[in-house]
């Protein structure tokens, strides 16, 4: 019985906190980021199962919240426009700002980036926080689109994400 806006803010705060924890595990404890992400994802999944009692949550979203994910503009779902805006913002950051260059440098060769003066720990930590925040945004939009929450949704997207990392030639 919580307003959708408040639930969205809490969701984003929780996701950002998960990003901070991931950053700590990767940067301070020196755990491989892929392994840390999978491990923390499992812990978060267990917490979600416990909190939700493994139930689907339906018919509790307001019509306004559902419109946020279901409306169309010019015959195209609004979710496409959200993705387009996010993509443009991320592209701009990556291609036209020092932070974007630092992210590319850190991802390409962390040691060389560090020797060039890039604060690689800060970049890795910030990237994990930003990724977690964006995952929260995606979860909110997804819930608005389908009109429900279930703890079984996330794991269905894990294998395609791992495959994307693998086929994208990322270092595991």
Go through each PLM region and give its residues.
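Structural signature of hydrophobic alpha-helical transmembrane segments
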Residues: 4-14, 80, 151-161
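Generic alpha-helical transmembrane segments of integral inner-membrane proteins
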Residues: 9-21, 47, 81-89, 129, ...
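Transmembrane helix-loop junction
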Residues: 23, 27-28, 49, 95, ...
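Hydrophobic/aromatic residues within transmembrane alpha-helices
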Residues: 43, 112-113, 166
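Membrane-helix/interface signature in polytopic inner-membrane proteins
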Residues: 89-129
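Transmembrane alpha-helical segments in multi-pass inner-membrane proteins
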Residues: 132-135, 145-172
């Amino acid at each position: 019985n919580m307003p959708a806006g408040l639930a969205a803010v809490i969701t984003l705060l929780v996701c950002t906190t998960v990003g901070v924890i991931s950053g700590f595990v990767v940067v301070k404890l020196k755990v491989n980021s892929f392994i840390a992400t999978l491990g923390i994802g499992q812990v978060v999944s267990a917490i979600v199962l416990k909190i939700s009692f493994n139930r689907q949550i339906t018919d509790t979203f307001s019509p306004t919240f559902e419109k946020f994910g279901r409306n169309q503009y010019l015959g195209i779902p609004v979710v496409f426009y959200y993705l387009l805006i996010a993509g443009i913002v991320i592209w701009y950051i990556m291609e036209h700002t020092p932070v974007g260059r630092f992210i590319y440098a850190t991802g390409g060769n962390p040691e060389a980036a560090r020797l060039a003066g890039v604060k690689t720990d800060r970049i890795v930590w910030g990237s994990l926080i930003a990724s977690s925040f964006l995952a929260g945004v995606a979860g909110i939009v997804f819930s608005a689109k389908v009109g429900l929450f279930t703890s079984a949704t996330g794991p269905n997207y894990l294998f395609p994400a791992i495959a994307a990392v693998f086929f994208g030639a990322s270092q595991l």
